[in-house]
């Protein structure tokens, strides 16, 4: 496209002025001198990494993970921390619920000796700690557990029964405006865990909503809805959960994909089970009757034995995972993305409250 010479000179002058005032890189052409690929961190689940389209959760962005109680929200975030620490990244956990179990975290592969942990007294304190860690540029992943536990200072200092309408929503709205830019500059991933509430008086449509107003919904680049879909049993004993995660919002790839995987009690996500299932689905692992084979060699009779074989032979498991990632992620990325579809609601954009 040919640009008028006078406009070109004026544009060059104003770009130079902006860069001089705000620093190099403060404004540029979209396709110029920047990587179009988004840096990501694995979720610990290959199926979910593929569903996200980019191979994991995006750095420099806000992510919301929500679902019912005991659905696997904290487990998923601990898996993200473990994956990030394996890459040498620094992680922090803001435990607003005061419920983090270090023994369980260690079982999932988290290096708790190098995990920063804070148990703030108020919501404002938690968000200020988040902002300070972000601005330092030294922390790569921050988890906030949970939005529902971020209680405003005024509510804590008040009496039980006092009305505090919109306080939490206003606090979150102010925090999002402040955090979003800092996260991008420091390339920090901020994950909020959230709980589900029921809208009162809803006759049609989904009555479920999340706490903290709507500001987080707008600022989040990725929103994950995690649900427990069944139980995993060994005989009469329940040893884990069948879990489904739906990507309800995705600004880095196509949304509305879903992933199914298993969470085993005391172990976390069943990665080798995923490798067996995905390997068979994509013809990487052969299944003949009850026998599973890889490259002509039998690896086990029945899914449980094949899973056990891969758990004991980590080199073969790593080879299968690498092949599956190359195969699936090259096809899963999309040229466009869409935000989640919201209902026709009147929204106070300051507090995020629906009225």
From Swiss-Prot:
UniProt keyword terms in alphabetical order: ATP-binding, Cytoplasm, DNA damage, DNA recombination, DNA repair, DNA-binding, Nucleotide-binding, SOS response
Superkingdom of the source species: Bacteria
Compartments it resides in: Cytoplasm
GO molecular function: ATP binding; ATP hydrolysis activity; ATP-dependent DNA damage sensor activity; damaged DNA binding; single-stranded DNA binding
GO CC annotation terms, alphabetical: cytosol
Pfam families for the chain: RecA, RecA_C
Protein task: Can catalyze the hydrolysis of ATP in the presence of single-stranded DNA, the ATP-dependent uptake of single-stranded DNA by duplex DNA, and the ATP-dependent hybridization of homologous single-stranded DNAs. It interacts with LexA causing its activation and leading to its autocatalytic cleavage.
Family classification: Belongs to the RecA family.
Protein name per its UniProtKB record: Protein RecA
Lineage of origin: Bacteria, Pseudomonadati, Pseudomonadota, Gammaproteobacteria, Alteromonadales
Gene name in the database record: recA
């Amino acid at each position: 496209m040919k640009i008028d010479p006078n406009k070109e000179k004026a544009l060059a002058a104003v770009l130079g002025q902006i860069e001089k005032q705000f620093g190099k890189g403060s404004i540029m052409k979209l396709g110029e001198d920047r990587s179009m690929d988004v840096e990501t961190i694995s979720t610990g689940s290959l199926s979910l990494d593929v569903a996200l389209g980019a191979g994991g959760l995006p750095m420099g962005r806000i992510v919301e993970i929500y679902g019912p109680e005991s659905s696997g929200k904290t487990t998923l975030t601990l898996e993200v921390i473990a994956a990030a620490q394996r890459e040498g990244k620094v992680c922090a956990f803001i435990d607003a619920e005061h419920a983090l179990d270090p023994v369980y975290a260690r079982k999932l592969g988290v290096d708790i000796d190098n995990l920063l942990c804070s148990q703030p007294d108020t919501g404002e304190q938690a968000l200020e700690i988040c902002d300070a860690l972000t601005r330092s540029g030294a922390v790569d992943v921050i988890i906030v557990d949970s939005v529902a536990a971020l209680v405003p200072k005024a509510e804590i200092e008040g009496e039980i029964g006092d009305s505090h309408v919109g306080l939490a929503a206003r606090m979150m709205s102010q925090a999002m405006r402040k955090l979003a830019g800092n996260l991008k500059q420091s390339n920090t991933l901020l994950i909020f865990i959230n709980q589900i509430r029921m809208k009162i008086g809803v006759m049609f449509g989904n009555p479920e909503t999340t706490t903290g107003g709507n500001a987080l919904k707008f600022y989040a680049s990725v929103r994950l809805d995690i649900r427990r879909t069944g139980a995993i049993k060994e005989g009469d004993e329940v040893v884990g959960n069948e879990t489904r995660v739906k990507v309800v919002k995705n600004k880095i790839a196509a949304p509305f994909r879903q992933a199914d995987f298993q969470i085993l009690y005391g172990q976390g996500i069943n990665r080798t089970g995923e490798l067996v299932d995905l390997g068979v689905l994509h013809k990487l692992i052969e299944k003949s009757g009850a026998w599973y084979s890889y490259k002509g060699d039998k690896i086990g009779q029945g899914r449980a034995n094949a899973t056990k074989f891969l758990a004991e032979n980590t080199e073969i498991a790593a080879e299968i995972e690498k092949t599956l990632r190359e195969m699936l992620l090259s096809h899963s990325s999309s040229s466009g993305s869409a935000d989640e579809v919201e209902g026709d609601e009147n929204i106070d954009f300051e507090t995020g409250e629906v009225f």
